[in-house]
């Protein structure tokens, strides 16, 4: 390093350097920052349209077998937390099963979700972020719900 460069550096550190040189330096930085901001703005629009599969949250399905009417509130809580619930009422009494299905189907409707009978005494309740494909409605018309059958 030459003596002139060393002297200029010391003068610059002390604040006695030529102001024109500093102004040019800061103007260049400001121009670069503006360009960066414009680039960021266009990048966000492109990024909003692309969804990576790996960033999607995995949905967990909850399986419950309620033994009392009070268990229906925990089923509704799972739906409120946007989790699908499979409810097994095969071993429940008919009146209890009907009350639970009435309560949970009302909660599902209020949350904008759907329900579907999967099997005899087994129901699928899903929140509004989950779609059910495949319908079994014709089976309901022919066979009815399990609590309406006489044994």
Curated annotation (Swiss-Prot):
Q: Where in the cell is it found?
A: Cytoplasm
- Alphabetized InterPro entries for the sequence: Cell_div_SepF, Cell_div_SepF/SepF-rel, SepF-like_sf
Q: Name one GO biological process term.
A: FtsZ-dependent cytokinesis
Example of a GO cellular component annotation carried by this entry: cytoplasm
**Keyword Cytoplasm: yes or no?**
yes
Q: Which UniProt keywords apply?
A: Cell cycle, Cell division, Cytoplasm, Septation
Any idea what job this protein has? Cell division protein that is part of the divisome complex and is recruited early to the Z-ring. Probably stimulates Z-ring formation, perhaps through the cross-linking of FtsZ protofilaments. Its function overlaps with FtsA.
Give the family per the record.
Belongs to the SepF family.
Oligomeric form and interacting partners: Homodimer. Interacts with FtsZ.
| Full protein name | Cell division protein SepF
The species is: Desulfitobacterium hafniense (strain Y51)
């Amino acid at each position: 390093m030459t003596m002139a460069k060393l002297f200029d550096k010391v003068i610059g550190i002390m604040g006695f350097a030529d102001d024109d040189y500093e102004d040019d330096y800061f103007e260049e930085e400001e121009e670069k920052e503006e360009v960066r901001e414009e680039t960021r703005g266009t990048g966000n629009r492109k990024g909003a349209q692309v969804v990576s599969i790996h960033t999607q949250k995995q949905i967990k399905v909850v399986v419950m077998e309620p033994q009392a009417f009070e268990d229906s509130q925990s089923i509704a809580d799972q739906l409120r937390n946007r989790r699908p619930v499979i409810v097994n009422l095969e071993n429940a009494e008919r009146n209890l099963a009907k009350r639970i299905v009435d309560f949970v189907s009302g909660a599902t409707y209020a949350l904008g979700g759907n329900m579907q009978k999967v099997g005899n005494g087994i129901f699928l309740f899903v929140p509004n972020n989950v779609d059910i494909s495949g319908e079994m409605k014709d089976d309901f018309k022919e066979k009815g719900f399990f609590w309406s059958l006489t044994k």
